[in-house]
Amino acid sequence: MDFSIKGCDWSKGTANGFLTGKSDCIVLGVFEAQTLSGAALDIDEATKGLVSRVIKAGDIDGKLGKTLFLHEVSGIGASRVLLVGLGRQDAFSQKAYGDAAKAAWRALLGTKVVQVTFTLAQLPVPERASDWGVRAAILALRNETYKFTQMKSKPDAGAPALKRVVFSVDPADDKAAKVAAKQAVALANGMDLTRDLGNLPGNVCTPTYLANTAKKIAKDWGLKVDVLGLKQIQALKMGSFLSVAKGSVEPPQFIVLQYRGAAAKAAPVVLVGKGITFDSGGISLKPGEGMDEMKYDMCGAGSVLGTMRAVAEMGLKINVVAIVPTCENMPAGNANKPGDIVTSMKGLTIEVLNTDAEGRLILCDALTYAERFKPAAVIDVATLTGACIIALGHHNTGLFSKDDALAGELLDASREAGDPAWRLPLDDEYQDQLKSNFADLANIGGRPAGSVTAACFLSRFAENYPWAHLDIAGTAWKSGAAKGATGRPVPLLAQFLIDRAGA
């Protein structure tokens, strides 16, 4: 799909190209109380009041998400007009813009429209310019067109009729909007990869499959990749990671993917992704109902790989390292047992009180390994705890960090990207819940504040650099009729790296 940008100030008579240019459809916004957007006012004038007459007739009331097509419109170059309800003008927000864009794309994708002129990016979203509107609209469109059908006997290969979108933006935002469009396409491609990896079944998306995916990213985009196998992992004395992996016949993989967009001496940002490609719970077996969704327990790894692909396509001037420890968590005669004590790469001993708290056991060794890169920051991403879902539901990703500056950067990025996160506490008092009578620490801290104690566990292995933990258990996938991976938190991570790179 092709996206292009054209500057236009609808209020100053510079819209003639949009009025007369050939297009299958032009998209206009309509607020409640019969208030037209700037573009809609100009089109209304060019069509001798057609838009106003339609609104006064009650065919569209401006409520958020309502749409109406006008056909065979005279006075303009577009053969159709799509009116999109924007809701109340005084309540128009970032979310309302996203909902309006989504409604527009859904309406358009149900037609044979090939080329569309999209004016909504210029709507007055508080604290957002039209370049932001372009990016959000492209991501909304790509979300609407995403399909996962490759595992069906007859995959749906049908492509939408829509092939070209022309965005009208404020002239001052023209250059920034072109950058935003490029970044949005790269981000959408990274999110699609993340969603594909999450949606694949566990018998396909194995640790070896993830490793091969990393190799393909490296080959396609010129990155450096190292995949460590069992013997190399053993040589590094990653006893905690290996204790989880040993219960499965699938061999563990330890993936290191490096993107170098800045000077070699520049300290990298390290992203660590939990890669449990299927989590049965191990000996602490999960209930059968809903266990199929434990194929999504590698979404931390998937989001890290998707982010790396997006960063490479954007060409950001920053160094980034992705680390993915990946294995299955399965019950077997040689699997971890409750009460076992294992030794981590750092040398700390861990009492495994619950084998279903395995994510932290593989991440802790990866966090220790990250030290060798002398990182500017380390961010781990994991579907770590059901407790985070209880605390935050399915809207906000849980953010934990003792570094206020790093946490602030991530929260700013989450707001800019529309990929919300919420900071939760990481006070030292919670560490007491991880005490063990027999080892340096236990892998669980009881029911109270389960997401916090999980983050506290990880913090023991991330003391030598700025560190943050993202718990995506509630945001990495959806259940029910809309079951599927979401691609989150790729937008948050990518925006954080864009900001760090100054792009």
Swiss-Prot record:
> What is the native source organism of this protein?
Burkholderia pseudomallei (strain 1710b)
Subcellular location(s): the record lists:
Cytoplasm
Query: Where does it primarily localize?
Result: cytoplasm
Q: Which GO terms describe its biological process?
A: proteolysis
What Enzyme Commission number(s) appear in the record?
Answer: 3.4.11.1, 3.4.11.10
Protein name (Swiss-Prot/TrEMBL)? Probable cytosol aminopeptidase
UniProt remark on cofactor binding: Binds 2 manganese ions per subunit.
The active site lies at: K286, R360
Q: Where does Mn(2+) 1 bind?
A: D279, D356, E358
Q: Which PANTHER family match?
A: CYTOSOL AMINOPEPTIDASE (PTHR11963:SF23), LEUCINE AMINOPEPTIDASE-RELATED (PTHR11963)
> Is the keyword Transcription assigned to this protein?
no
